[in-house]
């Protein structure tokens, strides 16, 4: 079993901060509810209730939606509510048996947050009221050992841990925004009932859109069928062999090639001797989305949880049916850019559910979930990643619970290999990547700072690449990298019009950095860097790729973890051959 390192400790710290903030917000809401009930009571009744204190108690409950073989208990502070009266009045039961009648809410209640505060377990987002459906409709959840089901306005959160969880982060009043990150406020301005909103009695705060922050935005019209010009997209044409000849990097001799073969065989034997179960951390989180969820809600769920993909659960088939990734959302954005139904792409995305939207766009998708099992050795699991050209491979416990235990990645496999190897093949790891011929050098695609964002999105979709370097048109030096992970940052906006996608890509990323502290994306290496140093840098920075540059910071190539893993598991591919 591999024990998690700094990455899990950092995530735990983030979750603890969220829990503290949510606990404070719940206390504030409870006090406001108590004050509201006092204002509705007659004076004599208020005195009889003992100052109008509402009863709060610890209640050990077993959720009715939990599988019959599972018993999960949680301690929660609750206030008894009864909404069955004919006048739509809210009736609160007090500790002395009195009923407090409150007028019906005139303000629409916000949807719950997508994120559960629990760190450990499987989080399933399952919509029961995406289209305003009410009632006691039972949801079929993915089978787990222990399921904790929290019923809220629009969806269920199913968490396999028995830890108490709060998930009303998004339902707090913005009067308390002085102690809250303003970026966690209103996500969408759509009037739909399933829209996540934040309400206030005085004013409504909306995160500014890209167009409102642009000083040079002249694309105010709705560009339905804009012709996409690729004139600002270029390709690095000089191959690695020519670059090595110019810089004096030596070719691999027969003795070095022997060390390479021996080192690669050591790595292969190590991976064949360990299973996926060995890589699964002690604690972790897997987010699962129901196929009935609205596309917009799925988009928000990925951003809220800081992930790039999630398995899809079909409640009718009682099985996992695939993955939804940021690549899918790129195709969705491009679809609504060309065929907008309104001036807000996010509003358009709320129309379709995940299960029906793929019929609207002609995108090739796997017919079933590509997965592996805990008993599969890491060599076979890595081969699946490389064969299907995917970045994430779910590890499914098909024998017992049919639940997803972990999402395996190139980074996780390489990190486990580097940390757990008893004796690393240092001779192989000390060879420069330029000599090994790892990476893409002859066909590196780059864009300019003024390239429209929509052209970059089309490039990522057409070329099936995960990132593209951004080059300054004056200096020809790299200034940034646009990756697929940047796509989810768009969900932080309240409105995204089709014309916003016409903005220059560098301007968009600068806005993201100013508003939402977008993490640094430029991680580089050179052809002279050793293979071991490159692997360590990717793992430490938690990035999938490095941009290979020369001494003047001009792009020469791209080196990804997929390239490294493919090189280690296959025949020698030096530039001599």
Swiss-Prot record:
Function: AMPK may be responsible for the regulation of fatty acid synthesis by phosphorylation of acetyl-CoA carboxylase.
Family that this chain belongs to: Belongs to the 5'-AMP-activated protein kinase gamma subunit family.
InterPro entries, alphabetized: AMPK_gamma/SDS23_families, CBS_dom, CBS_dom_sf
Keywords, sorted A to Z: CBS domain, Fatty acid biosynthesis, Fatty acid metabolism, Lipid biosynthesis, Lipid metabolism, Repeat
UniProt cross-references to PANTHER family, sorted A to Z: AMP-ACTIVATED PROTEIN KINASE, GAMMA REGULATORY SUBUNIT, LD22662P
Any one annotated GO CC term: nucleotide-activated protein kinase complex
Single annotated GO MF: protein kinase binding
PROSITE patterns membership: CBS
Compositionally skewed regions (Low complexity) per UniProt: 58-88, 165-226
Domain of life of the source: Eukaryota
Species of origin: Dictyostelium discoideum
Bias type Polar residues, positions: 106-121, 138-155
Name of the protein in question: 5'-AMP-activated protein kinase subunit gamma
Residue ranges occupied by any CBS domain in the UniProt entry: 279-341, 364-426, 438-499, 517-574
Region Disordered, annotated ranges: 45-226
GO BP: any one term: regulation of carbon utilization
């Amino acid at each position: 079993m591999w024990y998690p390192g700094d990455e899990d400790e950092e995530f735990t710290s983030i979750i603890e901060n969220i829990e503290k903030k949510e606990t404070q917000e719940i206390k504030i809401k409870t006090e406001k509810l108590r004050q509201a009930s006092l204002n509705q009571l007659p004076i004599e009744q208020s005195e009889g209730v003992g100052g109008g204190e509402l009863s709060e108690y610890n209640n050990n409950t077993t959720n009715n939606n939990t599988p019959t073989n599972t018993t999960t208990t949680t301690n929660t502070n609750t206030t008894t509510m009864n909404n069955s009266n004919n006048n739509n009045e809210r009736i609160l039961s007090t500790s002395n048996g009195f009923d407090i009648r409150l007028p019906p809410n005139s303000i629409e209640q916000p949807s719950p947050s997508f994120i559960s505060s629990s760190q450990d377990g499987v989080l399933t987002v399952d919509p029961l009221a995406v289209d305003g459906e009410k009632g006691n409709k039972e949801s079929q959840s993915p089978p787990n050992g222990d399921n904790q089901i929290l019923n809220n306005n629009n969806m269920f959160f199913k968490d396999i841990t028995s830890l108490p969880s709060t998930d009303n982060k998004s339902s707090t009043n913005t009067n308390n925004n002085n102690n809250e990150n303003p970026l966690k406020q209103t996500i969408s301005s759509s009037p739909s009932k399933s829209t996540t909103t934040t309400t206030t009695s005085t004013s409504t705060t909306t995160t500014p859109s890209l167009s409102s922050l642009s000083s040079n935005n002249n694309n105010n019209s709705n560009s339905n069928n804009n012709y996409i010009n690729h004139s600002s997209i270029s390709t690095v044409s000089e191959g690695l062999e020519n670059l090595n000849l110019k810089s004096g990097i030596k070719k691999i001799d027969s003795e070095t090639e022997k060390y390479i073969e021996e080192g690669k065989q050591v790595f292969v034997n190590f991976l064949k001797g360990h299973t996926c179960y060995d890589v699964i951390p002690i604690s972790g989180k897997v987010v699962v989305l129901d196929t009935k969820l609205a596309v917009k809600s799925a988009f928000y769920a990925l951003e809220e949880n800081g992930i790039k993909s999630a398995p899809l659960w079909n409640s009718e088939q009682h099985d996992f049916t695939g993955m939804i990734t940021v690549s899918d959302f790129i195709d969705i954005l491009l679809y609504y850019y060309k065929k907008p139904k309104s001036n807000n792409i996010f509003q358009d995305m709320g129309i379709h559910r995940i299960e029906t939207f793929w019929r609207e766009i002609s995108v090739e998708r796997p017919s079933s979930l590509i997965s592996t099992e805990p008993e599969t050795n890491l060599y076979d699991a890595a081969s699946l990643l490389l064969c299907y050209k995917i970045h994430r491979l779910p590890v499914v416990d098909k024998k017992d619970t049919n639940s997803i235990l972990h999402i395996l990645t190139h980074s996780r496999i390489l990190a486990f290999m580097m940390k757990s190897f008893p004796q690393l093949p240092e001779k192989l790891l000390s060879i420069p990547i330029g000599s090994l011929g790892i990476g893409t050098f002859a066909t590196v695609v780059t864009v300019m700072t003024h390239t429209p964002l929509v052209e970059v999105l089309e490039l990522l979709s057409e070329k099936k690449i995960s990132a593209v370097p951004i080059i300054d048109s004056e200096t020809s030096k790299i200034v940034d990298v646009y990756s697929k992970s940047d796509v989810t940052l768009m969900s932080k906006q309240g409105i995204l019009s089709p014309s916003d996608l016409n903005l220059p890509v560098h301007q968009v990323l600068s806005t993201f950095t100013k508003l939402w502290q977008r993490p640094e994306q430029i991680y580089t290496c050179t052809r002279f860097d050793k293979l071991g140093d490159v692997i360590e840098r990717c793992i430490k920075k938690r990035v999938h790729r490095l941009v290979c540059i020369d001494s003047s910071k001009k792009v020469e190539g791209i080196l990804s973890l997929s390239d490294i893993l493919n090189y280690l598991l296959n025949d020698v591919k030096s530039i001599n051959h």
